[in-house]
């Protein structure tokens, strides 16, 4: 199971966006902080109304990105912009429920982000 960065499927792209928001916000939490991210809190609403809920999640993510400092926030903002630009305009605005394909994309994107973070940390040592 690997991330398909070439997929333009609406459901796949929305899954990727949710994963980036989830990992970005979680990366600002202290290790002992076990509260759910906004992406996880709005998971069900997102699966049913992705366009509308993405607006809420993205606006909630903004303070966390600002807290990261330039390096971290730029990385996540680039990913969000790259993924968003892959949507057809009408598909992005389509607020109908997502298929389970978004779950696959979410898992693949989270896995890639954590794998990259682990590899980056090992290179620093």
Question: What feature does the model see in each segment?
Answer:
Residues 1-125:
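Intrinsic-disorder/low-complexity detector
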